[in-house]
Amino acid sequence: MMMSTTSSVTTIRQNFYHNGSIPPITLEQVDLASLTAKSVADLVNSLSGTRLGVAASYGEKCVLVALAFSSESRVLLITMNGTSGSAKREKNLLRDELLCNISLEKHGYFMERLAAALYLDLGLYIRQAFDLISDGDRRGSMAAYKGVLARARTQDSLNESVVEYIFAEQAFILSRQSEFALRAWACYVGVQGIPEKPDVIDTSAKNPQARLIH
């Protein structure tokens, strides 16, 4: 579980594609208990559309330890610690402006796992959440990750070894936060080449049967 209470803003670069002209990415890291409306607004204002890339990292017993949201030019990385559960104002901000903001689509991998962790760990719901890959055995495979990124930017050559490194299972640590942030950025880039998907995860639905809407 993350115990840092600091926040930081840095600049990182993607290395998935052999293309030096892709602009640098601003990475803001903040503990949930220190989340501000400005941090959220800076992310949302950097969007050119309605789709966000999302990445999550889990600790022991699948407890959520880090959550990242990405546009093309900015990543907001939120870490959890022992005070996260009681950070009511900040949790409400996260819920209202990002997680349950129906004007924003949230795209990532294994989104049903994130939905469960948000509810069990923080008592939060998520709406307009979509899984980038939903076809059975391909989920979570390196071939699937590479395929999504390759289709997203056909004009650029994909560095497959970087994809394998970034998406390898590894514990989240602050000293490697840029690598985790790039997962969210990759989800943002990947979804830009995918048409609208019919299946949406909505854990705020009162009817349990309607929580996965087809």
Give the label of every model feature segment.
Residues 51-52, 57-190:
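Conserved DEDDh/DEDDy metal-dependent 3′-5′ exonuclease domain
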Residues 1-52, 124, 132-133, 180-186, ...:
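N-terminal accessory regions of nucleic-acid-interacting proteins
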